[in-house]
Regions:
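Charged, amphipathic alpha-helical linker segments immediately N-terminal to NTP-binding catalytic cores
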Residues: 1-23
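P-loop (Walker A) phosphate-binding loop of NTP-binding proteins
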Residues: 49
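Conserved lysine of the Walker
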Residues: 54
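Hydrophobic positions on the alpha1 helix immediately C-terminal to the Walker A/P-loop
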Residues: 57
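Short beta-strand-centered segment that lines the nucleotide-binding/catalytic pocket of NTP-utilizing
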Residues: 65-80
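Conserved nucleotide-sensing/catalytic segment adjacent to the nucleotide-binding pocket
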Residues: 81-126, 136
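ATP-dependent NMP and nucleoside kinases share a basic, alpha-helical "lid"
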Residues: 124-173
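Small-molecule kinase domains that catalyze NTP-dependent phosphoryl transfer to phosphate-bearing small molecules
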Residues: 146, 175-209
């Protein structure tokens, strides 16, 4: 009986999560799906600031739509890539080359494909993930609109957040010690990328509560 109730609660949470998608987001995606022919793929990017709700939105969309969801966090730099020269690049704090080679270049493969997400525990590439062909593909995370990928997206979103709300969310999610790394490392690198390429200018700007 307890397991049955837990299953019901989980189903309710999933339904609530799916219905939490902002109308401006679902409307833009629905329009892109209608505009493109049934045989063509639709690619959606969710870029934006740390703590902006990109992952939460991506997961909600994956519950609502028949799609693939990819996380840019699965493409952290490997140890040998973490050099001063790499970090000096605007947008260099992600393995954008591998993401393009392993994911973007294969989205149209009829038989699907595999890629290896980065494992933050072992700091190595993890076991291969098998991905089926889907018409709709959603890529969430900072650097998802990196110009290295070209003009590939039908819709781009940019998640915005005030510095005060960003601080509160990161502290609640990651704690004080991890927050220091965000402030000293990750947020400055993201801001450098945003400013260098003016990422928000090609995006629908959204605030996710």
């Amino acid at each position: 009986m307890r397991q049955l109730q837990q299953d019901k609660d989980n189903a309710f949470d999933m339904e609530q999560h799916r219905d939490s998608v902002p109308e401006e987001v679902s409307g833009a995606i629905d329009a892109a799906l209608e505009k493109n022919e049934l045989t063509s793929q639709v690619k959606i990017a969710i870029d934006g600031v740390c703590g902006g709700g990109k992952t939460t939105l991506g997961e909600a969309l994956a519950l609502r739509y028949d799609c693939n969801l990819f996380h840019m966090d699965d493409f952290f730099l490997r140890g040998e890539q973490r050099t001063p020269e790499r970090y000096a690049q605007a947008g260099g704090n992600v393995d954008y080359e591998r993401f393009k080679e392993e994911v973007l270049d294969h989205l149209a493969d009829d038989g699907g494909f595999t890629y290896r997400p980065f494992d933050c525990v072992t700091m190595e590439l993890g076991e291969p993930c098998t991905v089926p062909y889907k018409r709709l593909n959603i890529i969430e995370g900072a650097y998802s609109c990196h110009p290295y990928f070209g003009d590939i997206y039908q819709v781009r979103f940019f998640a915005e957040l005030s510095p005060e709300e960003q601080r509160a969310r990161i502290l609640a999610r990651n704690g004080e010690e991890k927050y220091k790394r965000f402030v000293n490392e990750w947020i400055p690198m993201e801001n450098k990328y945003f400013d260098a390429y003016r990422i928000w200018e090609k995006c629908i700007r959204i605030s996710i509560t």
